[in-house]
């Protein structure tokens, strides 16, 4: 078990220590579940009453919340960001093996960097290139001439198709498929004719992709995911989509083909975005958004209907379905009033 003295932790986090620096911290936990030896954090002053009840040995908080804290504290400007760094230091995720499993199947002309780890039953095909420190989990498939940058980790059962390019220090969760065929077909008198997808997928550095997400290869040009992008679980990204640097995509999002999303965007969960259009930089789409037109101005956009009691929702739906007729009747009343 990893442990660290509170004063040493304060130094690493650039935090101001209040209380006993000799306390030994062995883990991080939420305010209500933390026990002796663990550290927690308070990032929202609305929950400061929990400070009186927590069993944590120390709390990360702001100067404004310090008077309400009854245990040792680390004072910082941004407790949530500090929590992220603290969790990295106290991470309990198992470290990967540092060898190549005997059951792994590796093509003779695949290129492996230094300190590469490959799990049981993984397959590395001809011409694939793995950079230094790459971790390939059990059951993964890396296709012909794929390239994976240094320090990238694939959890178990990830599929990387031929010629896909992953940057450095990426993290791909289990079940994700990158580089499968895009949904491309031509119609010949009612019969669908498959269009081979001749592009690939190019993913930048420090990209994280959640479990069971699918990213299709391009039809002619490539599907491109920029540097620092984070994508949640069970998203579908169609062929030729381009996502700009540091954009965040929450779970269950569907992006149609040839969509271009700018930098620093945030796409809420279960949103659906039309293809063959652009969304500019610094756009936030709230959850369940349906984006049918280009967005040219930064800002926050919404289209979902918030939760209502069923009886109220039924009335709202009826009004929406009859909005044209209601509008006509309202205009008729306005004309009568104007003529009085």
UniProtKB/Swiss-Prot annotation:
A GO CC annotation given for this chain: membrane
Active site (record annotation): 239
EC category name: transferase
SUPFAM superfamilies reported in the protein's UniProt record: Trimeric LpxA-like enzymes
PROSITE patterns: HEXAPEP_TRANSFERASES
A single GO BP: lipid A biosynthetic process
Molecular function in Gene Ontology: N-acyltransferase activity; UDP-3-O-(R-3-hydroxymyristoyl)-glucosamine N-acyltransferase activity
Biological pathway: Glycolipid biosynthesis; lipid IV(A) biosynthesis; lipid IV(A) from (3R)-3-hydroxytetradecanoyl-[acyl-carrier-protein] and UDP-N-acetyl-alpha-D-glucosamine: step 3/6
Reaction catalysed by this enzyme: a UDP-3-O-[(3R)-3-hydroxyacyl]-alpha-D-glucosamine + a (3R)-hydroxyacyl-[ACP] = a UDP-2-N,3-O-bis[(3R)-3-hydroxyacyl]-alpha-D-glucosamine + holo-[ACP] + H(+); UDP-3-O-[(3R)-3-hydroxytetradecanoyl]-alpha-D-glucosamine + (3R)-hydroxytetradecanoyl-[ACP] = UDP-2-N,3-O-bis[(3R)-3-hydroxytetradecanoyl]-alpha-D-glucosamine + holo-[ACP] + H(+)
Key words of the record: Acyltransferase, Lipid A biosynthesis, Lipid biosynthesis, Lipid metabolism, Repeat, Transferase
Documented EC number(s): 2.3.1.191
Self-association and partners: Homotrimer.
Cited function: Catalyzes the N-acylation of UDP-3-O-(hydroxytetradecanoyl)glucosamine using 3-hydroxytetradecanoyl-ACP as the acyl donor. Is involved in the biosynthesis of lipid A, a phosphorylated glycolipid that anchors the lipopolysaccharide to the outer membrane of the cell.
Family indicated by similarity: Belongs to the transferase hexapeptide repeat family. LpxD subfamily.
NCBIfam families recorded: lipid_A_lpxD, PRK00892.1
Official protein name in the record: UDP-3-O-(3-hydroxymyristoyl)glucosamine N-acyltransferase
Gene expressing this chain: lpxD
């Amino acid at each position: 078990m990893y442990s660290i003295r509170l004063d040493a932790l304060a130094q690493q986090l650039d935090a101001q220590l209040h209380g006993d620096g000799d306390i030994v911290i062995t883990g991080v936990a939420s305010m209500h579940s933390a026990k002796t030896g663990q550290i927690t954090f308070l990032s929202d002053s609305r929950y400061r009453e929990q400070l009186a009840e927590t069993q944590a040995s120390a709390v990360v908080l702001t100067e404004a919340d310090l008077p309400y804290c009854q245990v040792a504290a680390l004072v910082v400007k941004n407790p949530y960001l500090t929590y992220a760094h603290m969790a990295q230091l106290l991470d309990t995720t198992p470290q990967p093996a540092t060898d190549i499993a005997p059951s792994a199947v590796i093509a003779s002309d695949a290129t492996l960097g230094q300190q590469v780890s490959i799990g049981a039953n993984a397959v590395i095909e001809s011409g694939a290139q793995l950079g230094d420190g790459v971790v390939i989990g059990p059951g993964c498939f890396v296709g012909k001439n794929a390239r994976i940058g240094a320090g990238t980790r694939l959890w178990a059962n990830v599929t990387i198709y031929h010629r896909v390019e992953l940057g450095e220090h990426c993290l791909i969760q289990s079940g994700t498929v990158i580089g499968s065929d895009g949904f491309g077909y031509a119609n010949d008198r009612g019969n669908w004719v498959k269009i081979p997808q001749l592009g690939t997928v190019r993913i930048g550095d420090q990209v994280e992709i959640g479990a069971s997400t699918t990213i299709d290869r391009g039809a002619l040009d490539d599907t491109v995911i920029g540097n620092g992008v984070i994508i949640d679980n069970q998203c579908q990204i169609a062929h030729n989509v381009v996502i700009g640097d540091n954009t965040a995509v929450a779970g269950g999002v569907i992006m149609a083909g040839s969509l271009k999303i700018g930098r620093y965007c945030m796409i809420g969960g279960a949103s659906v975005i039309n293809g063959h259009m652009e969304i500019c930089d610094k756009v936030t789409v709230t959850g369940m958004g349906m984006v049918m037109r280009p967005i040219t101005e930064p800002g926050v956009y919404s289209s979902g209907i918030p939760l209502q009691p069923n009886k109220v929702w039924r009335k709202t739906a009826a009004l929406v379905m009859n909005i044209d007729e209601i509008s006509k009747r309202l205009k008729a009343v306005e004309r009568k009033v104007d003529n009085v």
